[in-house]
């Protein structure tokens, strides 16, 4: 028995009664419900499935979490079974349907705009829960992206008529379709948007409005090169408002933190970046001075051109000190430092230094339970900083030559 697909013939009808044709268990511990008619749009053509409820007096409202088409009929995924032959009430989530229809009609308008203005063909369309993307076969500039967005929104504001009709596939070559598909056969659904000399016409199985105004707004969120063309991420209507509300809140929070107005955030961040760069430069200079002082001190304390020490510096400074010490061709060093919750080490030697840094790393790893390694010339690693590892380190440093050489 064929299913009457109200989402195609009467898309404004979001609720109806229907007779249960079948209800079979599925592999997801739920049931696939088939009815003789349905207002639910099944996922397809890039558009997400409707969700909603199915109601009967015995079970109340049972959620419909997904719909899909199989063998020409629509199956509704539910968590409870229904008896064959019983009459149920199907109700689509109106807010979700509005959001999805806004995205789909908006996608037609945006794709049409880039086709008319730049001859860019839509070669991919995907609707997710929070964004929509189209893939174009041309890589467009920022200015071209904005021009297409403006063109599409002007079509929305004109409240242009949208006409939906069916034709036989044999008639398709005679129609000014935006996209050609020679594989189609039988009856084909066409969605047409009036646009003067550039009428938008495309094959489509999705839900659409009867005019463009309900799309509300089309906003491009980002675009990037993709394969040989570009991928455009956008949102329409309710979804566009959700994005604006979230991003505006973030902008105002950032502006408040910087003590500026929202339109002054970029300049304020640029000033902060300049300040940070200046402070980083001063820090590098101080670290270099500190490394020089530690290097001189450690070099003086070394025995037989070798030093092992636990230093109160970060790992970058530790590496700099090791490099400075080992500028002496005959010198070797094993230096340790604390960084956050880890104990880190670096072993290094000059060109003629006696320390085998790879072997030293293996010994340190075994003693501290550390992970690391390297070459005979340099090695490094780390382990969690605990009372036990710090005690082990004190034991290593008490007889470094014996423990590391």
Predicted features, each with a name:
Residues 1-405:
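A glycine- and charged-residue-rich anion-binding loop/surface
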